[in-house]
């Protein structure tokens, strides 16, 4: 093994390390996607679930902004990622220890789960940030490396779906933390993306965030993202309740997640070719429309697990497009010294949208029913696409794309 690694150049070794970080992060994440199912089993209604998720989004806003600015000030994305991975994994593993049988249990969970999100909400954004920045700087193929993350998420989802009847939902929390040790260890060996030299002790450094918010393209993307993430929050967080409404066991949720992750792979693999032919904004636009098609299918035609799987394929395709294009879009728009902050504020904006999506979504779901709810969500996806399309007017995007992504 040592001889094999000695023959690899620095970029090849870092590509393997990045797969260990990002790929196995998503493998571990697949085991931790059953929080909604756990709370559903604990007696939480869709409205109560919406409140929990909204509170989590509030904390998420502070989380990604805090860790983003900490990363830029320290000049180290890697240290921040290690911190949030360790903190988020430990606190998430302890969720089943919060009692659910007492009268005050829902309040305890509504306090503890958002607290977990101070770390957990920043785990995936900064794992992705480490990957996209190193891919750009080392001229690695982001689409291929990220597709391995989707592939490993698929494998993890299938494993937990088969294991869940024997394992039990409450044990998925600590299993997630156990598998998260792999990306934590691999992050120690990851390359630190280029950054400013951290400020000396006692030295104050201006972040110049006004430079970021004067960027019209970035602000237009934030506007699109606000509507888009309201729809995403509504679509994803209430899917177990939708499954129950059409007679599908919500414990089959892992199969849906595995299929979606599999469908992300084609667009990620061909992202270089797509970027050579289409501007990033067009790819982002296509992603929201594909997700809207899924919601139309759920609202009009799905009535079983197989038909759900058919339409969820569209969401997977759309998510593959969005993953491959959105991170690089933010990376290209942001100044070199504000890239982590740009990603952090975009993620914070998604959390703000998540608050509205979860609070309103839970109440609307209970009021109008699952089918009509998902038709409404499809309209939000189409609306976000329309708003983003309007921002194209009078602007020309440079279509010349570096070959590394």
Segment roles from a protein language model:
Residues 1-12, 190-223:
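Juxtamembrane intracellular "pre-TM" segments in multi-pass secondary transporters
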Residues 62-76, 164-165, 267-279, 365-366:
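Helix-to-loop junctions at the C-terminal end of transmembrane segments
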Residues 114-148:
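Cytoplasmic helix-loop-helix junction between adjacent transmembrane helices
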């Amino acid at each position: 093994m040592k001889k094999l690694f000695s023959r690899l150049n620095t970029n090849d070794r870092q590509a393997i390390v990045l797969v260990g970080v990002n790929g196995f992060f998503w493998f571990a994440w697949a085991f931790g996607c059953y929080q909604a199912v756990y709370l559903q089993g604990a007696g939480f209604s869709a409205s109560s679930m919406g409140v929990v998720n909204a509170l989590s989004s509030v904390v998420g806003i502070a989380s990604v902004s805090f860790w983003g600015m900490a990363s830029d000030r320290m000049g180290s994305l890697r240290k921040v990622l290690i911190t949030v991975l360790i903190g988020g994994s430990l606190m998430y593993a302890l969720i089943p220890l919060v009692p659910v049988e007492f009268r005050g249990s829902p309040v305890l969970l509504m306090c503890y789960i958002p607290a977990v999100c101070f770390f957990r909400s920043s785990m995936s954004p900064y794992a992705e940030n480490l990957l996209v920045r190193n891919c750009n700087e080392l001229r690695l193929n982001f689409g291929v490396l990220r597709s391995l993350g989707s592939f490993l998420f698929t494998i993890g989802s299938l494993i937990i779906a088969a294991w869940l009847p024997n394992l039990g939902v409450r044990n998925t929390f600590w299993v997630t933390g156990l598998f998260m040790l792999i990306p934590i260890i691999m992050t120690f060996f990851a390359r630190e993306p280029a950054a400013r030299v951290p400020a000396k002790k006692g030295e104050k450094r201006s972040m110049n965030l006004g430079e970021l918010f004067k960027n019209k393209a970035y602000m237009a993307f934030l506007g699109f993202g606000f509507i888009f993430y309201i729809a995403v929050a509504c679509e994803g967080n209430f899917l177990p309740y939708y499954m129950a409404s059409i007679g599908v066991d919500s414990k089959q949720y892992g199969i849906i997640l595995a299929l979606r992750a599999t469908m992300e792979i084609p667009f990620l693999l061909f992202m270089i070719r797509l970027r050579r032919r289409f501007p990033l904004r067009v790819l982002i636009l296509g992603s929201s429309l594909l997700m809207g098609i899924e919601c139309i299918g759920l609202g009009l035609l799905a009535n079983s697990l197989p038909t759900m799987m058919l339409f969820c394929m569209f969401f997977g395709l759309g998510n593959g497009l969005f993953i491959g294009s959105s991170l690089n879009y933010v990376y290209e728009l942001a100044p070199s010294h504000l890239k982590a902050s740009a990603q952090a504020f975009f993620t914070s904006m998604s959390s703000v949208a998540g608050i509205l999506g979860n609070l309103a979504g839970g109440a609307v779901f209970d009021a109008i029913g699952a089918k009509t709810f998902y038709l409404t969500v499809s309209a939000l996806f189409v609306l976000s696409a329309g708003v983003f399309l309007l921002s194209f007017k009078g602007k020309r995007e440079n279509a010349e794309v570096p070959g590394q992504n």
